[in-house]
From Swiss-Prot:
The gene is csnF. Pfam families: JAB, MitMem_reg. Its main location: cytoplasm. Keywords: Cytoplasm, Nucleus, Signalosome. Residues 20-164 form the MPN domain. GO terms for biological process: cleistothecium development; protein deneddylation. It comes from Emericella nidulans (strain FGSC A4 / ATCC 38163 / CBS 112.46 / NRRL 194 / M139) (Aspergillus nidulans). It comes from the Eukaryota. This is COP9 signalosome complex subunit 6.
Length: 386
């Protein structure tokens, strides 16, 4: 959307009492759409739809989706009506429990607020889909300073109202006698909070853990000579062998975490052993360092820790080992039976093929013997006629 258009932000604050609950999945969709649009150097407005629930004075923004934008006859941005209706219906079929509906749309806008360039699409959604649709604006110019603003997101959510052309700062319209008051769409900012479900927390945690392995690469559009490409490959081949894939880096990080945990556990066990040795009168360390006094609180904690070990280790180790061995034997037996079945099938195939070969050979021998017999008969008949 062009930033040089006229701002249509209302001078009056919202008095509707609406409150927006914004979910992270919608934010991820918006961020992904804007990032791909910028990475591909695409032109044109960035527009998307918002799905959620409208319960009284609370509106939830739970999901978002991208929208196709077409240019109207007067150069304004519009949504293809048939495509948009089908798209919303598809998302409603997917999100049936809980039932989600179209509650608004989103786009990019300057920090000063929506402009007249946003009105065509907003009017289209108000007239055809939702009379109380909200408008979420993302401010790309505030992305760099978002980390320095104590976590404030670079976005604003608005509701649309109809106001007269001449509205004072306190919200009262100035109407001239005998003149009809014209009503235009104005936007008022709404408060919002971030709400996160359990499934969203898992998804965001996965994205956060795998984001460190993401990297951007630039593709060159200029074709280099084949000789130069071969030489570059030969020079770069040893360097590429040292690079690790994202999966390998994640595996190394996981192994390092487990190694650090094991080292910490070992140090704690060594500390407990040294403490018990220092207070035990029967040990050499206890006789040398008799100044160490037993602490009953620490001893009770150690005793509780040792008692919990029995829950991890079975009481009857022999029975557990026998059961484990029996399970291993069952698995091995099933594997051997499978191999035996494959061997039997292979032997059957060999027997069938051998029978076919023997049958062909037998037929050939019979044909050869029959032909020799016929030749002998023909030879005898010729001698008799002569």
């Amino acid at each position: 959307m062009p930033d040089e258009a006229i701002s249509i932000l209302s001078q009056k604050s919202s008095d509707s009492g609406l409150h927006i609950q914004l979910h992270p999945l919608a934010l991820l969709t918006i961020s992904d759409h804007i990032t791909r649009h910028a990475a591909r150097s695409q032109q044109g407005p960035i527009v998307g739809g918002l799905l959620g629930q409208h319960n009284g004075r609370e509106i939830t923004v739970e999901h978002g989706f991208e929208c196709v934008v077409e240019i109207g006859p007067n150069g304004e941005a519009q949504l293809p009506n048939e495509w948009f209706v089908d798209r919303v219906k598809q998302f409603k079929d997917v999100h049936k429990v809980p039932a989600l509906d179209l509650i608004g749309w989103w786009s990019t806008a300057p920090p000063s607020g929506p402009t007249t360039a946003h009105l065509p699409i907003h009017r289209q959604i108000l007239q055809n889909h939702n009379e109380s649709a909200v408008f979420l604006t993302f401010h790309p110019s505030q992305v760099q300073g978002a980390s320095q603003s104590q976590g404030k997101l670079p976005l604003t959510i608005y509701e649309s109202v109809y106001e007269g052309e001449s509205v004072t700062e306190n919200g009262k319209a100035m109407q001239v006698d005998g003149e009809e008051q014209l009503l235009n769409i104005r936007f008022r900012e709404l408060p919002y909070t971030i709400e996160t479900g359990e499934a969203e927390m898992i998804g965001i945690d996965t994205v956060a853990r795998t984001a460190r392995n993401a990297a951007a690469t630039e593709t060159s559009t200029v074709a280099a000579p084949s000789s130069q490409i071969d030489s570059d490959k030969q020079e770069q081949q040893p360097a590429n062998t040292d690079l690790l894939s994202p999966e390998e880096e994640e595996l190394i990080a996981s192994l390092n975490t487990r190694l650090n945990a094991i080292r910490t556990l070992e140090s704690r066990i060594s500390l407990i052993k040294s403490y018990l040795s220092s207070i035990s009168p029967s040990s050499e360390e206890g006789q040398k360092d008799s100044a160490t006094k037993p602490d009953h609180t620490i001893l009770r904690d150690i005793n509780s820790l040792l008692s919990n070990l029995s829950l991890l280790t079975p009481h009857e180790q022999s029975a557990f080992s026998a059961e484990t061995l029996a399970q291993n034997n069952d698995v091995s037996l099933v594997a051997l039976l499978g191999q035996l079945s494959q061997s039997v099938n292979g032997m059957r195939e060999v027997g069938k093929r051998t029978a076919i070969v023997n049958s062909v050979r037998r037929n050939r021998k019979q044909l050869g013997a029959q032909s020799r017999y016929e030749d002998d008969i023909l030879g005898r008949d010729g001698v008799a006629l002569g």
